[in-house]
Amino acid sequence: MAHTRTFTSRNRSVSLSNPSFSIDGFDNSTVTLGYTGPLRTQRIRPPLVQMSGPIHSTRRTEPLFSPSPQESPDSSSTVDVPPEDDFVFKNANLLRSGQLGMCNDPYCTTCPSYYNRQAAQLHTSRVSASRFRTVLYGDARGWAKRFASSVRRCLPGIMNPHSKFVQVWTRVLAFSSLVAIFIDPLFFFLLLIQQDNKCIAIDWRATKVLVSLRSITDLIFFINILLQFRLAYVAPESRIVGAGQLVDHPRKIARHYFRGKFLLDMFIVFPIPQIMILRIIPLHLGTRREESEKQILRATVLFQYIPKLYRLLPLLAGQTSTGFIFESAWANFVINLLTFMLAGHAVGSCWYLSALQRVKKCMLNAWNISADERRNLIDCARGSYASKSQRDLWRDNASVNACFQENGYTYGIYLKAVNLTNESSFFTRFSYSLYWGFQQISTLAGNLSPSYSVGEVFFTMGIIGLGLLLFARLIGNMHNFLQSLDRRRMEMMLRKRDVEQWMSHRRLPEDIRKRVREVERYTWAATRGVNEELLFENMPDDLQRDIRRHLFKFLKKVRIFSLMDESVLDSIRERLKQRTYIRSSTVLHHRGLVEKMVFIVRGEMESIGEDGSVLPLSEGDVCGEELLTWCLSSINPDGTRIKMPPKGLVSNRNVRCVTNVEAFSLSVADLEDVTSLFSRFLRSHRVQGAIRYESPYWRLRAAMQIQVAWRYRKRQLQRLNTAHSNSNR
């Protein structure tokens, strides 16, 4: 039997007619891949040839379905998988990054909620498609694609600023930056004076430690610079309306970072202190050029110090897009105190280096010798270049020794640091300088008397200005912190003042004023000044329901509501209003309208009937429960309302407070709504029996009716006995 077949080449062809996978964000259209062709190079395709018998290989191939005119020849022989650059997803680069692109901030309002659901799925689909295409196309450029793909796998994807990795890295960066800020001024203490030889030396042991630590912090900061090119950001123009939109395109991220803080970060990470202390200063130690180099060292350290503070403090205060680190009021106080200490550290370090320069200047002017001889004597590392006799003359020179005395030179504010420069202990030099800087900032340089040196005068003025700025900021933040702790008390005092002014304006009598003060005081103590209704407004319904169930647990203890369904209780809880009553307050009046049900939470009441009978009420009891029966009597079994007397329910008792009472009330209107919604349940015999049997009001009423019936029966028996005795006579 003849079969119609298609000639195929030696290269195996693949025929795909499967619908393309669909992920949320793609178009939902089904793409059918029914085109058959060679997997490598293609040639001219002849028309279909029909033949019988086995299939023989041919030189040309023909597709089963002709491609559309809009399709290119290459597109007909490839698997239709969207390339990375033309991805149709919004924020597709974040989704491709897997875990790095997921948002781990539960309070985020920027990242769409579908990120965490689709990142892993999209990442897997892309990798499988890429591998399929690499296997499918084993042409000459396959090795380059495989190499690029392997390199791409080693690099991190575009990272979400709210991902867990970025949050952890932010904490590492903050700690590293804090260490770097603390380390930078310590480079000033690496220079010291050996008093025995009257020369300047470098503490190489401490230098190795500081250079290593500074290099580690620079490496961490440099890694952070590289990560900034892979960190998505919120477009500033998108914050005008809405919560903002994440930008995850690599080129846009790089362009945004280059235009932003890239140059500042590169200046921060540049190892200027290491270069100065290891290369430049040792070459010119003991010369007059060293003075300018020390000035450069001081300037570069301070110029790097300020940008580091500019980058670190917002990071610690949580004002960055990478998440919060410290969020409490105590942390804010610690940050301000830390800023104060770092400023004192910088001031003390500059003071030490300036004192060292002043001592060196004194030694340079002490002995009139050549520059090379002076350098060999002042630089301890070049001491071997000077003769022994010359070194002895240098050590015993009176002018040189006078440089280390109080009256030997005009030191001004650096007088106490002269002998400090001779200390061999690095920690001693650092700790005393830190104490001096902290003391001067705290006292605003009140005990300093500078000399006529211009640099010394400006340094003192800078200390005063810095102290004023930091002290004002610290005091202001401490005041705000302490004020926030005492805010409730201030609100209570303002409320009390407003109430007093209102009572004075209305000219209330003194007895009413006293009662108003007691009510305000007890209400504030019961509620702690918090309006619970305002708090509930912005909460979801299920959370409100759970909170009310926790707060109103007493409803389950109330005898009337012990048999009610949870839905009825939830409806009642939604309508409860908090009330407070002071001692001797009257809740219900005799022959007055019963306008509410009162649920006692704390305190005691007493119910006085018409006959003078007293029924005590305490925590868990209810007064005004007759409203429930009255409202049920106005509802038909089908839920419709019948016409009731407009006067309402009249109370036949007095209810007053024996102590201060905290309670919740349910108004008549709210109770009518509940009874109309759940009339079928509330009219059941079980609930009606519980209401009548368990209610203190109905029990008192039943007892009174029993007493009336018993007395009536007793009178009837007396009449019968009297009539019987009269008949016997």
Curated annotation (Swiss-Prot):
UniProt region (Calmodulin-binding), positions on chain: 678-694
Subcellular location: Cell membrane
Regions of this protein lying in the Extracellular compartment: 194-208, 283-295, 354-451
A Pfam family recorded for this sequence: Ion_trans
Domain IQ, residue spans: 699-728
Binding site for a nucleoside 3',5'-cyclic phosphate: 560-677
Biological process (GO), any one: response to herbivore
CDD domains: CAP_ED
Family of the protein in this entry: Belongs to the cyclic nucleotide-gated cation channel (TC 1.A.1.5) family.
Protein name: Putative cyclic nucleotide-gated ion channel 19
Species, as recorded: Arabidopsis thaliana
